Amino acid sequence: MSPSDSQGGLLRPAIIEELSRRAAAPARAVDEVRILRDGSEAFPVMMDLIRSAHHSVWFENFIFAGDATGRRFAKVLGEAARRGVEVRVLYDPVGTMMVKGGSIASALRSEGVEGRPFRPVSPLRPWTWSRLRHRDHRKSLIIDGHTAIVGGLCISDNWAGHSEGGHNWRDTALLVRGAVVRDVATAFGNMWRRATMETVPAPNAEAAAPPHAPCGMVAADQPGAHHVASVYIWLASQAQRSLEITDAYLVTPEPVVAAFESAARRGVAVRFLLPGNNNHPFAAASARRRYARLMAAGARIYEWRG
């Protein structure tokens, strides 16, 4: 995109409209955005928000381990539930199995918290590729319907800071306030219904953000929908000067990789920041197989060695 596509640091309405169409999500007002770096910064903020909740805490994560970090969160969630806050926890059991610490289910039960696994697996049922593939990779915390934290942080000692006895894995989260949080809550409600067959009250829908106001949108993929990929492909096609991508796993769909490659070939400065050490060797190997073609197109790839 060129400087003419923005006004005072804000994207033009036509750009917002196209992003909204591709994301299949309205652009809603954003009152505040804060970057939270790593668990050492994010986890205390998350726990303080849970302690401050008056009405509801909705918590969704790919990994909610039963280790020291998970138990600390379970305790804070339990305290909220005991003071009358509606607490709902949705976690992925397959993701949780990938880290040390075991299941968080018993700790949540002992704290009186309603914790539900998404698409649980059982040795009595066949482990089909569909059941293993369709997992809940989202990470969100929604407080009273008006404040949310989203990003890449899972609940495990791996993400906790060294001062908490954790491994301080590098990751990022965003704290968001404003009308856009309603769509984060809607995305949670949809996953909760898929996991439990229960419907949670729909959040109040608010009008779209006014023109030239700070706004955001929630691109919430479902099986068969590829809104996020559509947004990436379009952004890559529109980039004129630079395109910077950071991700834990470069296992994006082929059309997205092709869009990045095409941008580099037409002279856009395309730069990737990827992990040098990866907890999923197969994902790392798959990503590195794409390095040669991307670099041949002119992209630069940097690996984080922290």
Which ranges hold each PLM region?
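Charged, low-complexity intrinsically disordered terminal segments
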Residues: 1-306
